[in-house]
């Protein structure tokens, strides 16, 4: 195997552009850039409580409480991930945390059980978050299984998976009876063109907020065309306190806990891919300790979610694309986003206003952002060796093919057991598992481990230094005729 296929991310303490990731911008820029991140993730963040509330037949007031709790928890967990707590948790990268779609189907199944209902979802969420927090070190130590070849496959599969979200947004959003309406497509295309023009001709900070300006432009255009629905804005309150266990004491059902834990382990693997993608974008090499700290926040954030009437949390892939587009790598921007999310959770009127942004407006921006994630994965794969190691072609081809299966054929796995559905319907998870297994099969695991030891050992460096000193001494003697 070539060297580039076997290099592993080194320790997080060296060779990292801390001036970019840790740089604190001016308050005005932090607010604007933070709001840009919030607008990108907002539709996905509120979709989960809306879906669960609708399927469980909850009242409008109960669903509104779920949304407020969800936004509040997204903000808290984002702050934990970006700021961190000592050496225990927090990857300290520009990450936005939000509820995961992977757990929606199991949560609905749990909630439909009349014996436990919504309280059973909260109980399973809290318990599964606690269990996976304990498992984070074990999962994080799988880093040797993710050389650049596998990392490239994972990031490419993330891009391929989420770009479908952008396409659905551009057409009006899934479930919209007017899906594909030419007006939606036209506005989405106009937003895309507007973002490209800002990116091409604007300079400095204006270029960095091209996505935000595009969303504002699309919102105004939609409003002038009577395509903005502001219903509920007048009735929404200005302030609401998010309290823990507002629906009652959680119910801890063993079967539900096991189901949710299995789903969260899958989410953890996807989170590793998100972290690796973000590390590649910001130019920061991640160690297994970085990954473990990030995964711990996933687990602790899930516990917080269950306690405060919300659901499992994970890093949001849409915002990874935004970091790539804006080239603003400061984690303090996402810290600003976390504060804004907390405020939105406590100010329902603002939350309703942001929720009124049509999905087709976000679609134009989504095509740019999600395509950038895909391009990052392709860039990593382009650096791998396919000339002397033909096995790498098989690994990439098969892994991406398997990963695209649930996206291209929704019914492909429909006849298989229901317990496997969360795994089989995650294209990212399928691509990741395929790439890891195939890479170990073709290229071996022990070979990677040996290279890791060499990369962190300075024994060879000392030997080479002594040899170089002896050579220089010999050359000087020859010059003086000694």
UniProtKB/Swiss-Prot annotation:
It comes from the Bacteria. The chain crosses the membrane at residues 30-50, 63-83, 93-113, 116-136, 143-163, 179-199, 205-225, 262-282, 338-358, 360-380, 393-413, 422-442. It is a multi-pass membrane protein. Coiled coil: none annotated. Changing residue 100 to A: Decrease in activity with uric acid. Highly active with xanthine. Disulfide bonds: none annotated. One of its GO terms (molecular function) is urate transmembrane transporter activity. Residues 1-29, 84-92, 137-142, 200-204, 283-337, 381-392, 443-482 are cytoplasmic. Changing residue 298 to N: Lack of activity. Residues 51-62, 114-115, 164-178, 226-261, 359, 414-421 are periplasmic. Inhibited in the presence of the protonophore carbonyl cyanide m-chlorophenyl hydrazone. Changing residue 318 to E/N: Strong decrease in activity. It is found in: Cell inner membrane. Pfam families: Xan_ur_permease. The keyword Aminoacyl-tRNA synthetase does not apply. GO terms for cellular component: plasma membrane. Proton-dependent high-capacity transporter for uric acid. Also shows a low capacity for transport of xanthine at 37 degrees Celsius but not at 25 degrees Celsius. Belongs to the nucleobase:cation symporter-2 (NCS2) (TC 2.A.40) family. This is Uric acid transporter UacT. It comes from Escherichia coli (strain K12).
